[in-house]
């Protein structure tokens, strides 16, 4: 099956570019073709797209994360000579930095998910380091925490990316829903953005409602609003308006909803500001 999407307003276009970049990084561009302003997508491109999305985010933004900062401390800690006069001060500096990162709210929520599959407790280790006198033991325990972070890169690195990059553009749904912040990030993305597409494409859609972006019919129960998009969307259920004659028409089909989730990869982000040339 093939999906066709046309270039539209700047934000949707940035989402299309972001979607393209996900497929590019996943080496799936063979499933995409172009005809003037139309992007044609083979639905095979959506298989395991949730994993492709997460990996694209990691590849694009990993270098600018607290996770990366912590990981880069590994060689520094390993090279501290405990016989040096400054050794204790150096270890204390690295300890404070890693402790600060681990005690952030986003990392604590990540731990709540990870502890279901990994019984190592980094917070217990942090307390042990605080009480430890032996410098070699302090080093070893710090390196244990870094090894733990490396094992769970997808969770911790993505936590940084979610709150410093993705949240610039959208919020309150999927893994940014306040009730899902302790859940598996990949599965939350799949559940909110991909499973509705499978259901939508599996049946013949006939409806009085049409998607505001692609114009395809979409049932009210299968549609999505735009309130989750930062500074753009309006929650039509909470705010009626004479502007649309009290009948909301800002409705998205599941496919276009997915495209908007890719907006953070369509922009170039510098100093918490997004840049996109339409």
Named regions from a protein language model:
Residues 207-208, 215-243:
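Short recognition patches in nucleic-acid-associated and regulatory proteins
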Residues 233-278:
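Domain-exit/linker segments immediately C-terminal to small folded modules
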Residues 24, 225, 266-270:
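General "foldedness" signal
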Residues 197-201, 214, 218, 260, ...:
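Hydrophobic, Leu/Ile/Phe/Ala-enriched alpha-helical segments that form helix-helix packing faces
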Residues 1-209:
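N-terminal alpha-helical interaction blocks
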Residues 211-215, 253-256:
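Short cysteine-rich clusters marking metal-coordination/redox-active sites
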Residues 181-184, 223-226, 248:
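N-terminal start-of-chain detector that recognizes signal peptides
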Residues 200, 209-211, 251, 275:
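A broad, low-specificity signal marking well-ordered, structured residues that form hydrophobic/aromatic
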């Amino acid at each position: 099956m093939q999906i066709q999407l046309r270039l539209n307003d700047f934000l949707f276009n940035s989402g299309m570019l972001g979607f393209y970049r996900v497929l590019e990084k996943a080496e799936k561009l063979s499933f995409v073709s172009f005809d003037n302003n139309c992007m044609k997508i083979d639905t095979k491109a959506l298989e395991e797209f949730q994993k492709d999305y997460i990996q694209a985010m990691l590849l694009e933004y990993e270098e600018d994360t607290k996770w990366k900062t912590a990981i880069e401390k590994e060689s520094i800690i390993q090279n501290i000579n405990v016989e040096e006069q400054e050794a204790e001060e150096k270890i204390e500096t690295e300890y404070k930095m890693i402790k600060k990162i681990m005690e952030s709210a986003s990392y604590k929520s990540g731990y709540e998910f990870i502890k279901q599959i990994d019984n190592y407790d980094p917070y217990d280790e942090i307390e042990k380091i605080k009480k430890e006198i032996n410098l070699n033991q302090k080093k070893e325990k710090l390196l244990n925490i870094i090894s733990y972070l490396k094992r769970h890169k997808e969770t911790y690195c993505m936590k940084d990316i979610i709150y410093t990059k993705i949240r610039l553009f959208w919020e309150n749904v999927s893994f940014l829903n306040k009730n899902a912040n302790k859940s598996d990030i990949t599965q939350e993305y799949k559940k909110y953005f991909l499973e509705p597409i499978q259901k939508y494409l599996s049946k013949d859609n006939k409806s009085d409602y049409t998607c505001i972006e692609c114009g395809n019919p979409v049932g009210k129960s299968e549609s999505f609003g735009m309130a989750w998009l930062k500074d753009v969307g309006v929650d039509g259920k909470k705010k009626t308006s004479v502007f649309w004659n009290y009948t909301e028409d800002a409705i998205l089909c599941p496919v276009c909803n997915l495209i908007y989730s890719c907006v953070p990869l369509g922009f170039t982000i510098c100093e918490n500001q997004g840049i996109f040339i339409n």
